[in-house]
Structure formats: C-alpha cells, structure tokens
Amino acid sequence: FNEVFDVAVRMFPDDPTANINAAAIELQRGDLQQSVRYLDKADAQASATLNNRGVLKLLQGDLDSAESYFKQAQAKGSVEAGANLEEMVNKRKDDAIFGK
C-alpha cells in the first residue's frame, strides 16, 4: 500500500495530498528529513499536515511544538490529532514519573 503513495508523489510531486501521504509514510519509516521535505510541499493549514508535523516534533522530542500542532489539527477536526495529543500527554506523565 505504501508503494501507491510513493508512486503518487513521484507522478504528482507538487500535489499537496500526495505530499501529506508521502510524509506520513516517511514518518512511519523513521526518515524524518524526507518527511520534512514532503510536509513543506503540503497544504500548511490542512489538519493532516498539522497532525503530521506534530508527529514529527514528537519524534524529535519537541513536546511543546508537538502539542501545539496537535491542538491546531484537532481544532480543524482531526480525530488522529486528538489521539496523538492524548498519547503525548501520557508520554509527559511517563517522563515525569521516570525522570526523563
């Protein structure tokens, strides 16, 4: 299934939706630099872009920025961002408990 998104972004390199999907795939693969390249071509105000930027910031350890992106995406109706925000809150609690 990921191959479909890879092909789509190669065929339509400036399409915002193709870039959002490709960014999500790269985040799953752990290629944060490539995900940034795709996110930079996506619609900056789309809820999916904001959510993916939140995931990126979370993976980079920038919880404050991640929270901001998740809240913005959630305000635009992203259910995924709400779930990610909840996970981030749990991570902060774990970090506080375990002294990270």
Where are these regions (language model features)?
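Short coil turns that delineate tetratricopeptide repeat
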Residues: 13, 44-47, 76-78
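Register position in tetratricopeptide repeats
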Residues: 28, 59, 87-95
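Start-of-helix register in tetratricopeptide repeats
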Residues: 17, 48, 80-82
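Canonical positions in the second alpha-helix
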Residues: 7-8, 38-42, 72-73
